[in-house]
Amino acid sequence: MKNFIRIFAALLFCSGAHAQQVLRMGSIVAPASVQAQAMDRFADSVKKKNVGVDIRSFHGSQLGGGPDQVRNVQLGVQDMFMDGMTFLSDFSDDMRMAETPFTFASREHFEKWLQSASFKKIQEELIAKGNQRIINLGVSWRRGPMRVLVAKRPVLTLEEFGNLRLRAWQSEVITRFYGKPGLGATAIVIPLGDVYVGMRQGVVDAVTLPFDLVQPMKFHEVGSHIMLWDEYWQVLPMNISEKKWQALNDAQRRALTESVDEAGNWYNEQLAASVEKWKAELVKAGATIHNVNRAPFVQRIAERNRQWQKEGYWRAGLIDEIEKLR
């Protein structure tokens, strides 16, 4: 009997040793950003739970740009990635809606959609076509916690926006909605890490981004006008390879989902508590903060959304499903 117990214990030990999982998690943001710090807290929390998972962070586009890292996860050469939802739109036409500007009435409206049957279809498509899933739909990581437009001059009207050379990231959704077909700017695709130099050299006049990234990336040094316009309410999806997810046991999965929610709560608290401090620091550094009337922008996008839905840009009926959630 004692021999049986010793053998059984040895098998358990071997099983635990072989269950060790090392996950490579990437981002495109600066290591000093609140997002990167929160991701690192997530990794530390998982490690402390002692379930045999070691998450290693790679920030600042070390593993490539956003589209590259999403593709890495799809192919299984990278395990996890966290950034905007538009990077996932290749796998679901409906995902295009997630980061369209001036579509949702409020953050509450947007997050209600994330919990709806409509968004569940997107998760299913993401798994089937992208070989990855979002694991942090319990606690939304409220990026920013709002988005701003940083520019070399004030931009308060549609006409002024249409005269911009605006940095866009590598996404057809973004170039369509912010560019000439949508809000009217000239969209210039450059990596986020190149925007500072691009603005200094005149390649672009402006960049739209989460408020919490303005200071860490020093964009206020090259664009002294900051427009508060909430063009959309962004959340950060934590994507994991579906193959890797299926290889985890129940305890490991639970450790990941619990830890990502804990880190998400910390992230949200840090950002919410820092907004006024950041505004004051930016003004002290020479920036001017402007409020923007969203109504003309909302009207323009409402027209484009209906037009592009008729053309099959996303599933018929999607806009009506979203409107019913107001």
Q: Where is each model-derived feature located?
A:
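N-terminal secretory/targeting leader peptides
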Residues: 20-110, 118, 127-326
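Core domains of carbohydrate- and sulfate-ester-processing enzymes
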Residues: 121-122
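Sec/Tat signal peptide C-region and signal peptidase I cleavage site
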Residues: 15-19
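Exposed boundary/loop context
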Residues: 9-12, 57
